[in-house]
Amino acid sequence: MIGFIGAGKAGCSLARYFRKNGGEISGFYSRSDIPEDFIRFDTAEQIVESSDMIFITVSDSAIGAVWRGIDSSAVRGKLIYHISGAESSAVFCGADPDMVCSAHPLLAFSSKETPAEQIKRAFFTLEGGDTAVRAVSALLDRCGNRYAVIKPEVKPLYHAAACFASNLVTAVCAEAEKMLCRCGFAEEDALSALAPLIEENVRNVCEKGIRPSLTGPVSRGDAETVEKHLAVLEGLSRDIYTQLSAVLAEISGHTELLPLLRKKRFQ
């Protein structure tokens, strides 16, 4: 039996997904509303006692407090999980280290009813004790999800990688949107104008890989165009451009552009 503490978007979506794939869900303990098609428990201890696997699906900052609030005698022999990308299984202080695990899905849950097809495509990253990892691996095998096991000491680097591929992409898109507005685009048109470019680039990267998807002046070694860009960029936008272009120069093999990219604005 699988129980959930916390009824947010991720918890509710995963409960439905596991149930759809044959998992038995005991229910939820949560201070917020839970879906009507699940049993509600009045205390954390009650759901722990009624479950073999417990997923604590609260915000990262609340995991430790929720864990400390559960009677330690209730969790003996239970498999305990959280789904944070940033926290390791060490947040479950005092627990049997073999019985705890972080199981992070590389997916942004859009609602409490995230479609099963979306979750099935999610890659899960596991970190924790052998027994807990084996149990959740078996669950994910049944669901058809891919997963990898990492060591706790690389969890911050892992989470930074996830941020690079999601949050920081959003930041780059925001900078591009601002630049188009400076060119005279209406704010409501700027992002929609960029959308096909963004979508096609992400699709190419996912389908073809990094190197085959390279386009633009840096990938061609076009120093003249790069200089024109640098002449009109200032402040944070220029810093972002030069740093990311240096990465592209290394990937594409056009390292002759690096001195130009490292040159100060008015040097």
Task: Describe the predicted segments one by one.
Residues 95, 106-115, 130-132, 211-219:
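Predominantly flavin-linked oxidoreductase catalytic cores and closely associated redox partners
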Residues 1-46:
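NAD(P)+-binding Rossmann beta1-loop-alpha1 motif at the extreme N-terminus of oxidoreductases
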Residues 14, 32-37, 41-115:
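Rossmann-like NAD(P)(H) cofactor-binding subdomain of soluble oxidoreductases
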Residues 24, 33, 97, 115-206, ...:
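Internal alpha-helical scaffold of NAD(P)-dependent oxidoreductase catalytic cores
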Residues 201-258, 267:
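Interdomain hinge/lid region at the active-site interface
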Residues 55, 162-169, 234, 241, ...:
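Amphipathic, non-transmembrane alpha-helical scaffold segments
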